[in-house]
C-alpha cells in the first residue's frame, strides 16, 4: 500500500496546471491567432490603408507587483502593444485634356495600367508600436487580481463543434433521423429525414430547404452528387413529394434533377430571406458568407478534427470552414443510418462529444469581440474624418478592447470571486468545471440527462463533488489524474495490459473518452501480483459504455489508481467506499468550508494526498533552490544556494482572505538546516508540516446525552474552548473615503463635535485609530467631519446664530465607527492620498482602510462537521468534569448521536474514529487509500480491529479492544462516576469547524430603518432589518384567536406611521396606547389600483340626524386630524355652476 501511494504521487499532475497551461497557450498562440486575422483596413477611396502585425505583438512588464495591486485596488495587468503601419496612397487624378488624349489613342490595356501605376505615389510609413489594451496577467497560483480582488476563471464544458447523429420519435410516434452540424462560430446546419422519407436541411433551426436543392445551390452538379452519395436514388425518391408539391410552384418544373445551380440558389435565398428581391449574385454572396467565409463561420480545429473523424474525410485541419464535401458526406452518412442501419448514433452527454474551454480560449473569444468593435470604429473614423488628419494614434482607440476584457473579468458568469476559505477551497475552485455560462446550459432549463453521471466520466469528472442545489450535475470538478488535451477533451491515464500482465515500466497512456470506448478497461482496485499479472479468473471491465466481466488476458488497459475516479477534495476522505455517495458529496463540499484554525493539526487518518494538495494550492512556501538556511524570522526566510547566492522568501503575515479568514505563514525550518529543491519552508493557513490540516483530532463518543445531541446536535467539552482547539482568526476590512463636497472638503480629524475624550483615546493626532488598539462596537475608527449646509441645521442652531451672530463650525460627524456585534484588534491601517502618488477616484481626496482582527472561540450555535457528511450544530458546552470519560480517566471531547450513522449510511466515520483511537495510543498516523477490497474481503474492518488490538497490547489498556464488542468500550458518566449501561463506540475523529459561525448570523432589532414606500421595517441582517411576520404566521395567530396581538403586529409594530408615533408618545408618558389606524401598505395598494384607473375607495356607515345610515367615503391619504373635504365623485355637474366663471 505504501508503494502504491508513493507511485500515485508521482503520477499526479500539477493540480493547477489546467489554468496555467491554458493562459500560457493564450500568450504564445491564442492572442497571436486572433491578432493575425485582423484585416487590412482601407478607406472608401483606397487612399489610406491600416495594417496590424499581430505575430510581433509585445507585452510590457506589469506596472504593479501582485502585492501592490492587491494593496492599491489595482488590476495586475500588462499593456499590449502591436506593430501597425498606416500607408497613404496619393492618387493624381488625370485632367480633362489628358482624358481626351487617352481616349483618342489606341493603347493596349497593359500600357494604361502601367501609366496609372505611375500616378500613384505610395507614402510608406515605418511600423510603429501601438497600445491596444490592458491584459490581466495570471499570477503563479492560477488567479487574476482585478481591482485589488483575487478572481478565478473557471473552466466551461460545452458541446464540441462537429456533427452529431440522433434518432428521435415525433409526436405521432414515427421515427425521425437527424444530424446536427455544430460550428464554433456561425450558423448551425441540421439535416433530417422526416417520417415521410423526405430529406431536409434546416439552417439555424428555422429555415427548411430540400437537401438536393441545397447541394445544387452550394455548387455541386448532378454528377458530383451522384458520385458522392452511395444512395443517390434514395435522395431523388425522397424529393418526389417536394417536386410535385412545391417545386412546380417555385420554378415551374416537376423534375428535381432538371433544376440549375442558379434556380437552386434563388430557391434557397427565397427561403432564408422571403421578403427580399433575389438575384443570383446576392444569393451566392449570402450563402458564401453564411458557411464559407472564415470571418463569419468557423468550425475551429476541434470541429474539423471531429468531422474528419466521424465522416472519414481527409480535409486539412487548417481548413476551418465548411466544404461541399462535408455536406455531401453528412447526408450520405444520414441516409446510410436510415436505410442500412450502418454508422453510429451519437450520445451528446458522452465526454467524447463535450470539450472544456479554459481561461485561454475564453479570453481569446473576448479579444475577438473587442477587436471586431475596434475594426468597426476604425472604418467609421476613416469614413467620417479628414484623411490627411488621421494618424495611428487617433485611428486605433484601445477603449473597445479594454472594455471587452473588463466586462469579461468583471461580470462574466465564469469569472468568479475566488473561494479562499482554505487551501482545499482555493484548489477546487481552480479545477471547477461548469456547464453554465455563455454558450452553455441554463440551470432552469437543463434536464436530468445533462446532470446525470455518464460512464465516460470515469477518471475524468468526479462523480461525487457537485453542489446540492439547482446546480447539481451542472458544476463538477476535474478528477485527480485527469488532464485536458490540445482539443479540449479530458484525458485520463491507464497502464497497458499485455496478455494479463500490466506494463508498469512505461509511462501511462492518456486516453480520451472516445478512444477508451474501443478497449476493455479494468478498474484500479483489481489485485495485481508481484510479477505484475492480474489475479483472478473473472475481471470487471468497462467496454463501450457497459460494465461487463472478462478474463485477464482480454483486458487492454488498467486504471493507474483507485483515486483517479474522484476529485482532489473527495480524495481527502478516508474510508470513502464505506460512505453513501450523498454523504460523501456533503463531506467533500464541507471540507471547502472549514475555517483555518489558530493551531491546525494534521489528521491521524489521511489518504496520502494531503501534502500534494497543500503544495499545489500555493498556500505553503516551497524552496526553488538547494542549499542551507542562513536566516529565519517570522517575516522572511533566507536560503543560501550552492553558488553562495542568498534567495529570500517573504512570508504573508495576517493577510485577509476573500472570505475574511486569516492567511498567516509560519516558518518550519531552522538556521543551518540543509534544504533540497521543492522542500516546504513555511506552513500557511490550514496546513501543518506541509500537509493539509483543516481541523483537529478529537475524542468522540457515539451516545445520547440528555437529549442535547437530538437531530444531529453536538455536545462539546469546554476544553475545546479553553485550550483554543477550535479558535480561528477573522479579519474584517472597514473603509472610509474623504470626499470633496459642494460645501467644501470633508476632513479627517480628531476634532469631532459632541464626542467625549474617552471615545478619542485610541485615535492618533490625525484622527485615525492606532494599530494594535482593541476596539468594540460603536468605537470610532476614523474621525471624519463633513461641512453642513443651512438645510441640515437644527432650528435652535439657526436661532442662536441669528441672535448672537456666532459662526460655529457648521460640520456634522460622519466618522467611521465599528458596526454592531463586532470587536477585535486593529492589525493594519492603510492611508491612501494623492500626495503619496496613490490613484484615487475623482472627487476623493483620501481613503483610509482599517483591518480589524477578531479571535473567535467555538460557541453554541457554531456548525461543525466530520469528513463523511456528519454535520451538526453545537447545542451545549459542558464542563470538562461532567463529560463522559474512559476507563483511564480521559474525558470525551464531543458526544455525537449514534442515530446519525445507520440511516445516513456513512459508516466511514466509525472506521475513521476507531483507527484514529488506535493511532493516538500507538503514536502512529495512517494513510488509507479508498477501495481497499483488493487486499481481501472486509479489509477495512480487519485493519481497524488489528490496530486496536495492537494498541491494547502495547499500552496494556485491555479495555481498548473487547472481543465481544470490537470497537466499543465501557464509558463512565462524569457527573455520577457510574458506568453507562451499554458499551459505547469511542474514537478519535477528525472534526472541522465550518465558516457558518453564529456570530455572523445572530441578529436582533428593536428600532431600525424602514422602507420608504411601504413604511415596513427592512429585511435582512445587513440592513439591520426585522423578522417578517408572513402569511403563515398570520394564519397561526388567527387560528389561535389572538386578534389584538395580530392587529398590533400588522399596524403599530409595522407600517401605521401615525399610530407608531402616537404609541411611542403614549408609552413614554404612561398613557394608554391609542387605537391603530390604516397601514401604509394598504394605502400603497389603493394607490396602485387607482393608478390602473379603478375608482376604489373606503366607505364607512354613518348615522345622520334624520336617523338614516348612509355611507361616507373615508380619505385614507389625509391625516385623521385634518377635516378635509370628501373626494368628489365623477358625475358631470350642471352647466349653471360654471356660469359664474364665464364673465
Swiss-Prot record:
* Compartments (UniProt record): Plastid, Chloroplast
Do you know which Gene3D superfamilies this protein is assigned to?
2.40.50.100, 2.40.50.150, 3.90.1100.10, DNA-directed RNA polymerase, beta subunit, external 1 domain, DNA-directed RNA polymerase, subunit 2, domain 6, RNA polymerase alpha subunit dimerisation domain, RNA polymerase Rpb2, domain 2
The molecular function terms in GO held by this entry are: DNA binding; DNA-directed RNA polymerase activity; ribonucleoside binding
Provide the catalytic activity annotation.
RNA(n) + a ribonucleoside 5'-triphosphate = RNA(n+1) + diphosphate
Name the source organism.
Pyropia yezoensis (Susabi-nori)
The yes or no answer to whether the keyword Transferase is present is: yes
Q: Which E.C. number(s) belong to this protein? A: 2.7.7.6
- According to UniProt, the name of this protein is DNA-directed RNA polymerase subunit beta
Q: How does it assemble?
A: In plastids the minimal PEP RNA polymerase catalytic core is composed of four subunits: alpha, beta, beta', and beta''. When a (nuclear-encoded) sigma factor is associated with the core the holoenzyme is formed, which can initiate transcription.
- Kindly list the biological process annotations in GO that this record carries: DNA-templated transcription
Q: Which SUPFAM superfamilies match?
A: beta and beta-prime subunits of DNA dependent RNA-polymerase (SSF64484)
A Gene Ontology cellular-component term: DNA-directed RNA polymerase complex
UniProt KW Chloroplast keyword: yes
Top-level EC class, please?
A: transferase
Q: Which UniProt keywords apply?
A: Chloroplast, DNA-directed RNA polymerase, Nucleotidyltransferase, Plastid, Transcription, Transferase
InterPro entries membership: DNA-dir_RNA_pol_bsu_ext_1_sf, DNA-dir_RNA_pol_bsu_external_1, DNA-dir_RNA_pol_su2, DNA-dir_RNAP_su2_dom, DNA-dir_RNAP_su2_hyb_sf, RNA_pol_bsu_bac, RNA_pol_bsu_CS, RNA_pol_bsu_protrusion
Its biological function?
A: DNA-dependent RNA polymerase catalyzes the transcription of DNA into RNA using the four ribonucleoside triphosphates as substrates.
Where does this chain mainly localize?
plastid
At the highest ranks, the source species' classification is: Eukaryota, Rhodophyta, Bangiophyceae, Bangiales, Bangiaceae
The residues forming a coiled coil are none
NCBIfam families given in the database record: PRK00405.1, rpoB
